């Protein structure tokens, strides 16, 4: 664990983000992501990003990869402390009038499944992140190994 008396959380968060942001330029877009985003747009799905990243970082990351045109909104936090994706998602749904039951949240962690449940959305988990398929299957009945599988799965949910 961390001794926050010796290393305050804001200090640790800032140091983490320095290292994290330094590696971002080397991260490529996941295989089949662009094709899947295009397919979902053609299918009429409204797409937004809900992230624990700071919003200005998120905008920069999405824009640098030429993906901004796919999303109606980029929902990121106001600071680097990653406090509440649930609140961000809930506020977005309330503000837009979107029915949470009509939403599908795509993520890659069991935390994403917990966020989806908290806001009332269905969750699809992608195995391309750092958590195992077995762990993801405990969190959601919908788990995919390739983003290209997403459009067909959405037709069945």
For every predicted segment, state its role:
Residues 85-114:
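Conserved Lys-Pro-Asp/Glu-containing loop-to-beta segment of HAD-superfamily phosphomonoesterases
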Residues 63-65, 77-78, 86-92:
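Anionic-ligand binding region
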Residues 32, 57-60, 115, 135, ...:
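Phosphate- and divalent-cation-binding pockets in alpha/beta enzyme and binding domains
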């Amino acid at each position: 664990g961390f001794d926050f008396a010796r290393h305050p959380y804001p200090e640790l968060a800032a140091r983490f983000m320095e290292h994290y942001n330094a590696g971002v330029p080397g991260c490529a877009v996941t295989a089949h992501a662009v094709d899947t985003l295009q397919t979902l747009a053609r299918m009429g799905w409204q797409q937004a990003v809900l992230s624990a990243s700071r919003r200005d970082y998120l905008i920069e990351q999405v824009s640098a990869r030429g993906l901004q045109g796919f999303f109606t909104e980029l929902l990121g936090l106001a600071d680097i402390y990653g406090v509440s994706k649930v609140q961000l998602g809930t506020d977005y749904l309330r503000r837009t009038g979107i029915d949470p039951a009509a939403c599908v949240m795509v993520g890659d962690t069991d935390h994403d499944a917990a966020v989806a449940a908290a806001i009332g959305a269905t969750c699809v988990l992608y195995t391309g992140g750092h958590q195992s398929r077995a762990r993801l299957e405990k969190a959601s009945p919908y788990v995919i190994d390739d983003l290209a599988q997403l459009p067909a799965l959405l037709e069945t949910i």
